A protein has these predicted regions:
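Mixed-charge, Lys/Arg-rich low-complexity intrinsically disordered regions
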Residues: 1-8
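Conserved short "hinge" loops at termini or chain/domain junctions
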Residues: 9, 13, 43-45
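Short beta-strand-centered aromatic/proline hotspots
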Residues: 13, 18-30
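Short, structured interface segments
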Residues: 27-40
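Amphipathic alpha-helical segments
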Residues: 40-53
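Amphipathic, interaction-prone secondary-structure segments
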Residues: 50-75
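Intrinsically disordered, low-complexity regulatory segments enriched in Ser/Thr/Pro
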Residues: 70-96
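Ampiphathic alpha-helical segments that act as solvent-exposed interaction surfaces
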Residues: 88-117
């Protein structure tokens, strides 16, 4: 049976029915539904990334970093990490089977990520 992404946990924000709510010490949980999230990407993120897609989610981890997830289906992820002030964000396109690599990548930025499959 193929692995399916069900939740992503990051930082200290919790997404409740499309509305980000800060709760501590709990983490962000973004429920995977039909290939996209209910939060639209900000125009700032779109302009900085040069990528225009429907759906997705954006989240400022802190005052320095922005993290954006795109989901095409249950098997592919696109992750964008950008630092405020940088012109070009870091873009990673990953298969679900490489979630360990994604977690290791985020650890470089001191970001803990939990993905439930």
């Amino acid at each position: 049976m193929d692995k399916i992404i069900t939740n992503i946990t990051i930082g200290n924000w919790y997404l409740v029915r499309g509305k980000p709510t800060k709760i501590s010490p709990a983490n962000v949980v973004w429920a995977f539904r039909d290939g996209c999230f209910p939060i639209p990407l900000t125009s700032e993120i779109l302009e900085n990334s040069g990528i225009h897609r429907e759906g997705g989610a954006s989240f400022w981890h802190d005052e320095h970093y922005s993290i954006v997830f795109f989901f095409w289906n249950e098997e592919r992820i696109e992750l964008i990490i950008s630092k405020r002030g940088d012109e070009r964000p870091y873009i990673a396109k990953l298969d679900v089977k490489y979630v360990d690599q994604l977690q290791n990548l985020l650890r470089v930025y001191n970001i803990n990520l939990m993905i439930e499959l």
